[in-house]
Amino acid sequence: MEQYEDQPSDLELAQMSRENPAAFGLLYRRYIDTVYRYVLVRVPSPEDAEDLTAHIFENALSSLHRFRGDSRFSTWIIQIARHRIADFYRARRHDTLDPAALDEREAPGIAPDDLGLDTVKELLTRLPRAKAEVVELRVFADLSHSEIGEMLGKSEMAIRAVFSRAMK
């Protein structure tokens, strides 16, 4: 994220947070919306997204010693989010179906805000996973093409091409 006037950079905040975890609060406020939006589109419910987002920030705080500033903080925390989302689905694979939980999800009354998200999720499921991931990282995590390329081990031009094809 860009430098804020009269505020420390992300790298400075990360370094300060290693000694004083309270300094992590500003990083949290800068990135909570970005991380939450990214997670929300990839998990079944807003409650799951809230829980996962909290775990992601807990993990980031405990792993700050690994952040060296080689990439932007936003790239680093979204990488953590990708891993936690994968863990979330691995854990769910072993869960059994609970009929009571299914009944709760089918309760009448659809929130208007959920319609847009459901539509986006449906459209993303129609894309091949690699294209959907690029769209999610670009649109919901607000990462640049070069940051996505760095994260996925591809060139910026390749990511631009994938994103362009996915948006057609």
Per-region residue spans from a language model:
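Amphipathic, Lys/Arg- and hydrophobic-enriched alpha-helical face
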Residues: 28-46, 63, 124
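N-terminal module of bacterial RNA polymerase sigma factors
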Residues: 1-34, 41, 145
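A short pre-motif secondary-structure segment
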Residues: 134-138
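Arg/Lys-rich amphipathic alpha helix in sigma70-family domain 2
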Residues: 62-69, 79-99, 113
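DNA-recognition helix of helix-turn-helix
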Residues: 86, 140, 146, 152-168
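Internal acidic/polar
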Residues: 2-7, 87, 94-122
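Sigma70-family region 2
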Residues: 18, 41-46, 54-72, 91-93
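Residue-level preference for hydrophobic side chains embedded in well-ordered alpha helices
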Residues: 27, 31, 35, 56, ...
